[in-house]
């Protein structure tokens, strides 16, 4: 444990070195969380754009594979799953708030393929966009 390690240090310098290492590890963990938070912020802000993990990782100066692993570890979801959840959440709001066509809603939330939009919507909501809209009417 940390207490035993501190007690076992022989000199004040050893103690300082140990504490510096612990703080460094702690800050490294915080930076990882900060990177994931930045990704979540980008998804929340720009979900309707053509987003990719590769592009975001370039902005953050971090390896895309590593960033994908961090996202999975921190959120228990992949980048694509998080993006789809955000887009579908926005689509649900548009479907209920506006009378836009389902195709228009699809494009408004960032999908370029209506068939794929239907597939993802059904997977996450358990029903088609049309059925989702009708349930409230």
Identify the function of each model-found stretch.
Residues 67, 71, 116-117, 121:
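Short hydrophobic/aromatic patch on the recognition helix
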Residues 1-38, 60, 73-81, 85:
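Short, Lys/Arg-enriched, Trp-marked, Pro/Gly-tolerant hinge/linker segments that flank
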Residues 54, 65, 101-104, 114-115, ...:
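Residues within helix-turn-helix
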Residues 59, 108-109, 124:
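Residues within the alpha-helical elements of helix-turn-helix
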Residues 53-55, 61, 118:
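C-terminal amphipathic alpha-helical interaction region
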Residues 46-51, 78-79, 128-129:
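Short helix/strand-capping hinge loops at secondary-structure junctions
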